[in-house]
């Protein structure tokens, strides 16, 4: 579809984590992406993290400059010890013609109008929640926002918040760990992707600890799939199955990333 987009990599001491395109979303038949690894603070002078449109010939067109927006619209409670000026954008969804993107490092959800490039803040998560590292965004009548949390991993410290269109946050479900994805099925059941569920820092000890938790409308949680390693995203396909990007980071050797299909149990 498109290549040659900016990407960056952390040092080996931090795990050689690569940031490129953080997420994609469709408005009708038009594909959009959000960059996560661009900007001077990622080591790429002369670039910015943007929302871009993918053209039919494989080229891309900038729609909105997210780096510029967050530098001029600071959140209430940034974490000075863990601050990324350009942000590291993670999730993006399309709702009624607009795009909504999550920035975990600052802690915010922003609305982008793909027709005009206008950016506005839906919610400053840091203002009420502090530095919880929001990552996963899904829309199911309202927005639902999951968080990664801080390292070292503390089991049960993550949650999913309900976010209404006016920007108000309410706790939806808790006692989760390192949430990196949220999806819904046709029965109003939520599926939460936990990337790691062992205490400590990302490393060999976390291999195989990723899992998918189903949250029923009554709040009951059930693990429906386990044995995943550093999964990074989840979606439901047209066949009703879950699709998870497994080994999205942190694998023992490069090139092990895969998409796995999970049949939803009745």
Descriptions of predicted regions:
Residues 8-31, 35, 70-99, 128-143, ...:
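Beta-rich, blade/repeat-based domains predominating
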Residues 49-52, 108-111, 158-161, 210-213, ...:
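A short loop-to-beta-strand structural motif that recurs across blades of beta-propeller domains
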Residues 54-59, 113-117, 163-168, 215-220, ...:
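Short loop/turn segments that connect beta-strands within beta-propeller blades
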Residues 232-266:
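Blade-level signature of beta-propeller repeat domains, shared across WD40, Kelch, NHL, RCC1
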């Amino acid at each position: 579809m498109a290549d040659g987009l900016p990407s960056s990599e952390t040092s080996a001491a931090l795990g050689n984590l690569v940031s490129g395109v953080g997420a994609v979303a469709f408005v009708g038949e038009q594909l959009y992406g959000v960059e996560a690894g661009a900007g001077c603070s990622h080591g790429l002078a002369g670039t910015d993290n943007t929302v871009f449109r993918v053209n039919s010939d494989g080229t891309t067109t900038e729609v909105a400059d997210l780096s510029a927006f967050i530098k001029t619209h600071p959140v209430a409670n940034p974490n000075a010890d863990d601050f990324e000026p350009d942000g590291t954008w993670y999730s993006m969804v399309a709702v009624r013609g607009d795009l909504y993107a999550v920035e975990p490092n600052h802690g915010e959800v922003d609305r982008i109008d793909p027709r005009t490039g206008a950016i506005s803040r839906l919610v400053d998560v840091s203002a009420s929640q502090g530095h919880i590292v929001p990552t996963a965004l899904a829309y199911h009548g309202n927005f639902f926002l999951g968080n990664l949390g801080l390292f070292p991993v503390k089991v049960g410290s993550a949650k999913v918040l309900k976010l209404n269109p006016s920007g108000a946050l309410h706790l939806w479900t808790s006692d989760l760990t390192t949430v990196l994805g949220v999806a819904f099925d046709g029965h109003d059941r939520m599926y939460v992707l936990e990337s790691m569920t062992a205490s400590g820092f990302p490393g060999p000890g976390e291999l195989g600890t990723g899992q998918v938790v189903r949250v029923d409308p009554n709040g009951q949680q059930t693990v429906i799939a386990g044995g995943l390693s550093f999964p990074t995203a989840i979606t439901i396909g047209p066949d009703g199955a879950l699709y998870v990007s497994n080994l999205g980071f942190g694998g023992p050797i490069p090139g092990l990333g895969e998409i796995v299909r999970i049949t939803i149990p009745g």
